[in-house]
C-alpha cells in the first residue's frame, strides 16, 4: 500500500470513529478515541508529512518538544448550579454513602429517586427524609441490568418529566488480592463498580442532552481509585477504572451542558464500608477493629453534602479526606520520576498523533476552576 493510500485509509477510519462518538464534540480537539483507547489524529495529513521528513541527526537540531498548552481557562459552566426542583437518581441509596447523597440532594430541594435492593434498609431510610418523603421515589433496581436502566429512565420521565443528576454509587468492596480472586469475584466487581457506570451513561445521557436543562453524572469511586489498597487488588482495579471513565467523559462532554464528577472518599461511617454492599455474594465478615474505625469515619450526610457541593461547582474531582494527600503526592512524584527526559528529537508526526493525550486540557482547566469563586451547597 502506498503512503497516500495508507493515509487515506487512516483518515477514513478516524472519520468513522469520530462519527460514532458524536463528531461535533471532537472537531477542533484534533482527535478521536477509538476502541481500546487508540488515539487517532484527525489531522493525519501532517502525520504523513512528518513521516516523509528526515529526522534531524542526534546532536543537530534541539529536541522537539510538544507545543505549549493554551492558557488554562475554567472548565464548562456548572450545568446544575441551581438544584431546586431538579431530579436526581442515586443508585444504592437505601443506606450508607448513597443515602447520605440522597438526603443532601433532597435537602437542596431536588426530587430524589432512590435506587435500592433491600426492602428492610429502604424502610429504615425513608423516615430520614423531611416533609413526609415528599419528592422521594424508591425504585428497586439492579445496576447491572441494562434493560432495567432503560425502564428506570422511562419511569422517572413518567413521574417527574425529566432526569438531571445520576449518581452511580452502587459498589462492591471486594477485600481480595487480585492474585487470589476467584473469577466470579472479579466479574461481579467489574459488573457493579465499572460496567454499571457505562450502563447509566448509555441509558441516561441521550435524555439529558435532549431536554437541554443541564445534567450531571457522578461516580462514587474511592481513595482506592487513586491509591492501591492492601489486599484489595480487585477493588482497586475497578475504582481506578471508575476514575478514568469520569475523566474521559469530562473530555467528551465538555462542549455540552452535562457535567461529570468522580467522588473519591476515604472512610465513611456505614455498615457497608468493609462488607461490600447489597450486590456482593462474596461478602466477607468485618475485619478486627472495623467497628471502632467506623465510629471515627465521616458521617454519610457530610459525605453527601460534599458530593452536592461538587455537583453545583461541576468539580471533576470530589475529594473529602485530606489525610490521603501525602500518598497521592508520592504516587504522582513516582510517575514523574519514572518519565524519561527528552534526549533526542521527537518526530513532529508523533507529537501530533499524541496531542490529545499529551495535553487534553481537563487538568489545567480543573486547576484554574479551583481558583475562581465557588458556589455553596444549600439546604432549603
Question: Model regions: which residues?
Answer:
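Conserved glycine-rich cofactor-binding loop
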Residues: 94-96
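The beta1-alpha1 cofactor-binding region of Rossmann-like NAD(H)/NADP(H)-dependent oxidoreductases
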Residues: 119-120, 139-151, 183
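Substrate-binding pocket helix/loop in short-chain dehydrogenase/reductase
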Residues: 177-178, 182-190
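Active-site helix of classical SDR
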Residues: 201, 238
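SDR active-site lid
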Residues: 251, 255-327, 333
